[in-house]
Amino acid sequence: MKSTFGLLALAAAAKLVSAHATVHAVWINDVDQGAGNSADGYIRTPPNNSPITDVTSADMTCNVNGKNSVAKTLSVKAGDKVTFEWHHDSRSASDDIIASSHMGPVMVYMAPTEKGTAGNGWVKIAEEGYSNGKWAVANLIANKGKHSITVPDVPAGEYLLRPEIIALHEGNRQGGAQFYMECVQVKVTSAGTKTLPAGVSIPGAYKATDPGVLFDMYNSFTSYPIPGPAVWDGSSSGSSGSSDSSPATTAPEASVTSAPTKQGSADTSASPTTFVTATKPTTTAAPAAPPASTGSNSGSGSSGSGSASGSVKIYQQCGGKNYSGATSCEAGLTCKEWNPYYHQCLKA
């Protein structure tokens, strides 16, 4: 009998581990940089894919062993698209990314390497929460573990990019939310003029009782408050403040031309979700329990456009199939077509 219980416990533990995720690779402008999750790679990778659940732990910064640098640093420049590729086990096409029960937001932070390693200077540059009946993690799974950001116009130097998932399937109890994060080493080679704000400390940016951390995703709710600071708009130099109770706009599926991949990499036919965020429109009402991902991505995040009249602000949607909002961008912006379903206002 004891043996049976032991086997059941081991099976349950194995199932839990298999549901977790880490970042395995990065793409720059749709070019695969190869696996980066090793000591000779470019991702500060933890020894396993277990989550961090104590928001006061030093491991919140870059995960376990995250203070240790790795061999490589990726070169990027302002305006480059950086795509993070998450998996729970491997880059194989059959990998399920993360358990479908692990719904929650996806965010990206950036900090100068020295300050970031010490847990300071973290600036949120992208986030996606819950919108139009789907969680950010559902979109991530549909996109085969990929989501993207645009490198801001910051001064040249070495930085850390910190993609993060908060899984809320146990978020209805204090200490139940699961945090997954790694730090990617990058070197910005362009001479930008927009200095990052002072940022926040991690640990320190979250509390166990924050509404977006202690959150019951199984009860009826009308909005999800993404925790942490507000997203930096990429131009101001002020301090990152606290985020409000609505998820930020996130550009849906970006059009991607698959680049040659290194041997053993996963199928790259899915297009990553592109996060380019500036403002936070109000989220729509959510059902008591979020629907499961269908495996296709028809948009990740609110359009943020409001009504069909008026000028559309930077980084918000301005066109695309089935889109009925405003199509005229504010002065100095142009409506860029990412794919037939999503057009976005960007600097001309």
Swiss-Prot record:
<keyword id="KW-0624">Polysaccharide degradation</keyword>
<feature type="compositionally biased region" description="Low complexity">
    <location>
        <begin position="234"/>
        <end position="261"/>
    </location>
</feature>
<keyword id="KW-0560">Oxidoreductase</keyword>
<dbReference type="GO" id="GO:0046872">
    <property type="term" value="F:metal ion binding"/>
</dbReference>
<feature type="region of interest" description="Disordered">
    <location>
        <begin position="233"/>
        <end position="306"/>
    </location>
</feature>
<keyword id="KW-0325">Glycoprotein</keyword>
<keyword id="KW-1015">Disulfide bond</keyword>
<dbReference type="Pfam" id="PF00734">
    <property type="entry name" value="CBM_1"/>
</dbReference>
<dbReference type="InterPro" id="IPR000254">
    <property type="entry name" value="Cellulose-bd_dom_fun"/>
</dbReference>
<comment type="similarity">
    <text>Belongs to the polysaccharide monooxygenase AA9 family.</text>
</comment>
<feature type="binding site">
    <location>
        <position position="169"/>
    </location>
    <ligand>
        <name>O2</name>
    </ligand>
</feature>
<dbReference type="GO" id="GO:0008810">
    <property type="term" value="F:cellulase activity"/>
</dbReference>
<feature type="glycosylation site" description="N-linked (GlcNAc...) asparagine">
    <location>
        <position position="322"/>
    </location>
</feature>
<dbReference type="InterPro" id="IPR035971">
    <property type="entry name" value="CBD_sf"/>
</dbReference>
<keyword id="KW-0732">Signal</keyword>
<dbReference type="InterPro" id="IPR005103">
    <property type="entry name" value="AA9_LPMO"/>
</dbReference>
<keyword id="KW-0479">Metal-binding</keyword>
<keyword id="KW-0503">Monooxygenase</keyword>
<dbReference type="GO" id="GO:0030248">
    <property type="term" value="F:cellulose binding"/>
</dbReference>
<feature type="disulfide bond">
    <location>
        <begin position="62"/>
        <end position="183"/>
    </location>
</feature>
<dbReference type="Pfam" id="PF03443">
    <property type="entry name" value="AA9"/>
</dbReference>
<feature type="binding site">
    <location>
        <position position="102"/>
    </location>
    <ligand>
        <name>Cu(2+)</name>
    </ligand>
</feature>
<dbReference type="GO" id="GO:0030245">
    <property type="term" value="P:cellulose catabolic process"/>
</dbReference>
<dbReference type="InterPro" id="IPR049892">
    <property type="entry name" value="AA9"/>
</dbReference>
<feature type="compositionally biased region" description="Low complexity">
    <location>
        <begin position="271"/>
        <end position="306"/>
    </location>
</feature>
<dbReference type="GO" id="GO:0004497">
    <property type="term" value="F:monooxygenase activity"/>
</dbReference>
<feature type="signal peptide">
    <location>
        <begin position="1"/>
        <end position="19"/>
    </location>
</feature>
<keyword id="KW-0964">Secreted</keyword>
<keyword id="KW-0186">Copper</keyword>
<keyword id="KW-0136">Cellulose degradation</keyword>
<comment type="function">
    <text>Lytic polysaccharide monooxygenase (LPMO) that depolymerizes crystalline and amorphous polysaccharides via the oxidation of scissile alpha- or beta-(1-4)-glycosidic bonds, yielding C4 oxidation products. Catalysis by LPMOs requires the reduction of the active-site copper from Cu(II) to Cu(I) by a reducing agent and H(2)O(2) or O(2) as a cosubstrate.</text>
</comment>
<feature type="binding site">
    <location>
        <position position="20"/>
    </location>
    <ligand>
        <name>Cu(2+)</name>
    </ligand>
</feature>
<dbReference type="GO" id="GO:0005576">
    <property type="term" value="C:extracellular region"/>
</dbReference>
<feature type="domain" description="CBM1">
    <location>
        <begin position="310"/>
        <end position="346"/>
    </location>
</feature>
<keyword id="KW-0119">Carbohydrate metabolism</keyword>
<protein>
    <recommendedName>
        <fullName>AA9 family lytic polysaccharide monooxygenase A</fullName>
        <ecNumber>1.14.99.56</ecNumber>
    </recommendedName>
</protein>
<feature type="binding site">
    <location>
        <position position="180"/>
    </location>
    <ligand>
        <name>Cu(2+)</name>
    </ligand>
</feature>
